[in-house]
């Protein structure tokens, strides 16, 4: 499998453009299958230009090959010194612009059509999702429901073959509905892109961009951040689960119920034991923090600080709470105050202070976070 | 004043010796040589960075460099190849050849010529420091932005970005001065009888290149200065929270960045305009249309910059305008390809190394042209944008379009510069080696891009492994071939068969060809009395 793919890749490289015209679709030599009307239109446009490009290249290569075979000195061919003064030589310069303009207008005509579809925001959307890029994860807010999903990359151990293309919490969307995405960012530029269902628009801090789609087929669709956004640019994948509208409604109801229960739990006055917090914290740490600080807490030397025996994780509790809540300006450390609730934050901090030999024995309570937030 | 001394001495080939010959040089040939040597050094530094990038991408996972160092290498590879390699090499050729071609004794502004060159090593040191400063603790995040240095990311970066901004300032001053010098020389220093429409195409290409640089370089300098102010002096030109606009920087950058592409391409097109007639032994086909359409390309190139930003969310009307403008670029480019092919038509072709490069350029640059039209189509570009498809496209445009054109120029003029013929057999081996390995490197990248691999990622999913391995193997071969290039150059400089004044049989066909009437190597001062142009 892999070997044949490799051979194909070599062949593709050597045969230059001729292959590009014929070997579409299989073996990832082309775009993945589009599953929305707009991406289908873009795919068709891509195929049209690819075909025109292939034809042009065949013609150019053909003429050049003919010239090189026919008009060589070694065959005794003598140069025609007056060729450029002939009628052809005098007037041919009008030929190319006319032909090329014709091709250009053909392409531009069909492109303008698709472009108007892309920019058509007149129809009402059934689902509106605000997509927020931040270093280095995606947050999805369903504007009509009180649902918020934070989507982090899955570590290699869990993602397997989909590593760098798999996340813990995918965006769930219904099929057959008009979906509107609002793109923005919290820190630097990002670009949200899932080629099969929706094209790119940049996420720009302080601005909102809009795209839309209508997914025709259930499935899991993957993509990656397309605009360079710093250290973790390669590590912020995108996954969309497209499900039937019924399943989507059920998922939404469950999501709302769980969120309500979690909120209630976090705001209760219960005092938690260290072990309870540690157990909750481990899972939360692995999904939210291990992208940078690593599962074993060692970080990445020179890029992300380790937490094993670190001053923050073993020193003053308030300082630890402060950096997790508010982030650290000028570094990649994000502010988590708005992303996790008090109980979750308390659990993560407790975990960090007791895992990997950081045996401080501290149990940070949700109440501590509540007071620190003030 | 020097001229007076020379005349009394009757010794036109007297040249200063020692370091002063180079440091204080006002001689267009010596400055040209220094530009070319500088470009060669930078080619190896930028190439070494490319080798590190491809070595990292050979396998998925993080093997050789960390993500920040990787992105810094990507940034500096681009800047060094553009500002350190292609532009100085083209400027070196302009310095060497333009005065000889138009019958001028030297450049119009020889002292400024000296300064434009000597700013370059300073700029290169700043640029390399911006890469190395990350190894000193406390200097902040490395330059992990890519060469486009888009804010807000470039505001997060540490000290490296300041060094880079100062380097860009110096590079800009250097290019503007060099361009003013070249344009002035072309307008004022032509020998009697050398009308504009008799100038070799290379001179015309540099005329437009110089004008482009004079127009766009100040915009880049302004843009990066605003960035510097945002970073340190509390302004918010590019910060939405302070009423600024991050996209404004992209417009400023690409107003420079797109014409910059033609700055890189045009001199090489000029070289083709000499090489192809020479080895086809017949005059350039359609000289006048080529000049006019070069002017058209120059004008059009200035007003299509935003096709690099289709995804930033511009209005339908603006996007449509930039799409159609961009697609129209295929007209001048198409005409150039057409005219070069028909220069060969009914010619008497031989296949020396410069000609082999020229033919390869026609084919591969056409290919870059058709993928360029694909990319210009906005709806499709919303899928291609920022993937390896784009990386493949612009390497096809810039390596054949600019770099191979310079190689063709080096092989074409080395006999003139040194007085020795290069080893034709080694030249041909170098041609086949680079051309094949270049295609092996970049052709697969079209497919990894279509399959969804974004640019500038240090690690990739295993589905892209085959394409990346082929690409890396090709890149190593491509890199290695340049050692042969270096060997050929050193060998030719040191000795070899006498070249004679006109080493190429067809060199003077269809052009005044003044440069070929001088001996090889030409004397230190080419002309003491204006040459005659028929």
Where are the regions that the model predicts?
Chain A
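Flexible coil segments in periplasmic/lumen-exposed cytochrome c-class electron-transfer proteins
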Residues: 256-277, 282, 286-287, 335-374
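N-terminal secretory/membrane targeting signals
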Residues: 1-25
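Hydrophobic single transmembrane helices highlighted by the model
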Residues: 42-62
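Sequence/structural segment immediately N-terminal to covalent heme-attachment motifs in c-type
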Residues: 274-300, 308-326
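Detector for the c-type heme attachment site
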Residues: 226-230, 293-299, 325, 350-354
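Extracytoplasmic/periplasmic beta-strand context in beta-sandwich domains
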Residues: 190, 236-239, 305, 331, ...
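Alpha-helical transmembrane segments
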Residues: 57-73
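Non-transmembrane, membrane-proximal soluble domains of secreted or membrane proteins
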Residues: 25-48, 69-279
């Amino acid at each position: 499998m892999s070997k044949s793919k490799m051979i194909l890749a070599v062949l593709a490289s050597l045969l230059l453009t001729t292959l590009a015209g014929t070997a579409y679709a299989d073996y990832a030599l082309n775009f993945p299958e589009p599953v929305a009307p707009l991406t289908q239109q873009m795919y068709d446009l891509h195929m049209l230009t690819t075909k025109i490009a292939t034809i042009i290249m065949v013609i150019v290569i053909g003429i050049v090959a003919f010239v090189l075979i026919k008009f060589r000195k070694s065959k005794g061919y003598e140069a025609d010194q007056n060729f450029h003064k002939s009628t052809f030589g005098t007037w041919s310069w009008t030929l190319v612009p006319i032909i090329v303009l014709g091709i250009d207008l053909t392409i531009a005509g069909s492109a303008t059509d698709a472009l108007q579809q892309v920019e058509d925001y007149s129809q009402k959307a059934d689902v509106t999702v605000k997509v927020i890029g931040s270093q280095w994860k995606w947050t999805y807010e369903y504007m009509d429901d009180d649902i918020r999903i934070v989507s982090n990359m899955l570590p290699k151990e869990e993602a397997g073959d989909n590593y760098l293309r798999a996340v813990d919490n995918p965006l769930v969307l219904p099929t057959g509905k008009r979906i509107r995405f609002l793109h923005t960012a919290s820190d630097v530029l990002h670009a949200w892109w899932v080629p099969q269902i929706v094209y790119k628009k940049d996420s720009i801090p302080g601005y909102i961009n809009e795209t839309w789609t209508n997914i025709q087929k259930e499935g899991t669709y993957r993509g990656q951040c397309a605009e360079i956004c710093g250290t973790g640019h390669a590590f912020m994948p995108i996954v969309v689960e497209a499900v039937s509208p019924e399943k989507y409604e059920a998922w939404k109801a469950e999501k709302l119920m769980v969120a309500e229960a979690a909120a209630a739990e976090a705001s209760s006055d219960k005092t938690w034991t260290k072990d309870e917090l540690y157990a909750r914290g481990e899972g939360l740490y692995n999904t939210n923090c291990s992208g940078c600080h690593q599962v074993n807490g060692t970080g990445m030397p020179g890029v992300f600080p380790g937490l094993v025996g670190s001053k923050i994780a073993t020193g003053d509790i308030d300082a630890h709470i402060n950096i997790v809540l508010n982030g650290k300006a000028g570094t990649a450390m994000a502010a988590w105050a708005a992303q996790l609730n008090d109980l979750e934050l308390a659990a993560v901090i407790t975990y960090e202070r007791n895992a990997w030999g950081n045996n401080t024995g501290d149990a940070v309570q949700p109440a501590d976070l509540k007071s620190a937030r003030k | 004043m020097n001229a007076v001394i020379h005349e009394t001495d009757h010794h036109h080939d007297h040249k200063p010796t020692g370091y002063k010959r180079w440091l204080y040089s006002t001689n267009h040939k010596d400055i040209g040589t220094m530009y070319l040597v500088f470009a060669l050094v930078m080619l190896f530094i930028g190439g070494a960075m490319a080798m590190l990038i491809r070595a990292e991408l050979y396998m998925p996972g993080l093997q050789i460099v960390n993500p920040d160092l990787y992105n810094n290498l990507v940034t500096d590879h681009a800047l060094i190849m553009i500002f350190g390699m292609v532009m100085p090499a083209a400027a070196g050729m302009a310095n060497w050849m333009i005065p000889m071609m138009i019958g001028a004794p030297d450049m119009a502004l020889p002292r400024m010529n000296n300064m434009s060159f000597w700013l370059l090593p300073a700029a290169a040191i700043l640029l390399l420091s911006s890469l190395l400063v990350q190894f000193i603790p406390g200097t902040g995040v490395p330059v992990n932005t890519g060469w486009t240095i888009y804010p807000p990311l470039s505001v997060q970066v540490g000290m490296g970005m300041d060094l880079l901004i100062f380097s860009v300032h110096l590079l800009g001053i250097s290019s503007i001065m060099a361009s003013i010098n070249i344009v002035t020389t072309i307008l004022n220093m032509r020998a009697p009888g050398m009308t504009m429409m008799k100038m070799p195409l290379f001179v015309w290409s540099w005329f437009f290149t110089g004008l482009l640089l004079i127009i766009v370089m100040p915009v880049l300098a302004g843009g990066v200065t605003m960035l510097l102010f945002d970073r340190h002096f509390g302004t918010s030109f590019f910060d939405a929270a302070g009423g600024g606009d991050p996209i404004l920087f992209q417009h400023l950058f690409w107003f420079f960045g797109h014409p910059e592409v033609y700055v890189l391409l045009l001199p090489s097109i000029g070289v083709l305009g000499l090489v192809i007639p020479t080895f086809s032994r017949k005059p350039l086909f359609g000289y006048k249309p080529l000049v006019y359409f070069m002017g058209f390309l120059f004008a059009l190139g200035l007003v299509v910059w935003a096709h690099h930003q289709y995804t930033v969310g511009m209005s339908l009307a603006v996007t449509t305008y930039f799409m159609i403008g961009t697609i129209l670029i295929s007209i001048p480019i198409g005409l150039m390809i057409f005219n070069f092919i028909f220069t060969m038509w009914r010619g008497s072709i031989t296949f020396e190394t410069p000609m082999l490069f020229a033919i390869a350029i026609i084919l591969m640059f056409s290919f870059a042209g058709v993928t360029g039209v694909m990319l210009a189509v906005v709806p499709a570009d919303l899928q291609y944008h920022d993937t390896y498809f784009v990386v493949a496209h612009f390497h096809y445009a810039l390596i054949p379009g600019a770099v191979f054109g310079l190689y063709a120029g080096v092989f074409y003029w080395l006999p003139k510069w040194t007085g020795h013929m290069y080893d034709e057999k080694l030249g041909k081996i170098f041609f086949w080696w680079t051309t094949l390995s270049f295609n092996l490197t970049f052709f697969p990248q079209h497919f990894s891009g279509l399959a969804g691999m974004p640019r500038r990622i240090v690690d990739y999913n295993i589905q892209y492994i085959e394409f990346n391995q082929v690409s890396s193997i090709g890149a190593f071969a491509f890199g290695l071939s340049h050692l042969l290039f270096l060997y050929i150059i050193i060998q030719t400089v040191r000795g070899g068969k006498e070249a004679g004044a006109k080493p190429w049989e067809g060199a003077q066909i269809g052009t005044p060809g003044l440069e070929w009437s001088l001996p090889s190597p030409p004397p230190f001062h080419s002309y003491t009395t204006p040459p005659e142009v028929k």
